[in-house]
Regions:
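Core catalytic alpha/beta fold that binds nucleotide/phospho-ligands
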Residues: 2-120
């Protein structure tokens, strides 16, 4: 049982959606390109309230970083959706080292991301 727990990590992050409302994509493209890959930006911009989507994806990325023991950057983490469920893709060799369970919730003021990472 202890071995199983040692292979697990958990990360959680909450963010105010207003941080992304104040930094509109059209005026702050470089800021967004330092955090999100192109597919994530395109996904978020499809929604009327893209700030909630950006905040949710940011919270997920922060939660991933907190859930694993290795150094990783924002652009090494891609959040994708399979149906309505968020999934994680890692851009480097870490992808084969972890499985993730992800949950995200966002509403008018806050977004929260929770990640459980299993080291394989």
């Amino acid at each position: 049982m202890l071995e199983m727990i040692e292979n697990l990590g958990i990360g959680i992050d909450i963010i105010e959606v207003s941080r992304f409302r104040r930094k509109k994509y059209e005026e702050n493209r470089n800021f967004y390109k330092k955090i999100f890959v192109k597919s994530e930006i395109n996904y978020c911009l499809k929604f009327k309230n893209s700030a909630e989507r950006f905040a949710g994806k940011f919270a997920i990325k922060e939660a991933v970083i907190k859930s694993i023991s290795e150094k990783i950057g924002f652009l090494d983490i891609e959040t994708v959706y399979v149906g309505r469920k968020p999934r994680i893709r890692l851009k480097n060799s870490l992808e084969k080292k972890y499985n993730f369970i992800v949950s995200v919730s966002h509403e008018k003021e806050f977004a929260i991301g929770i990640v459980i990472a299993e080291k394989i």
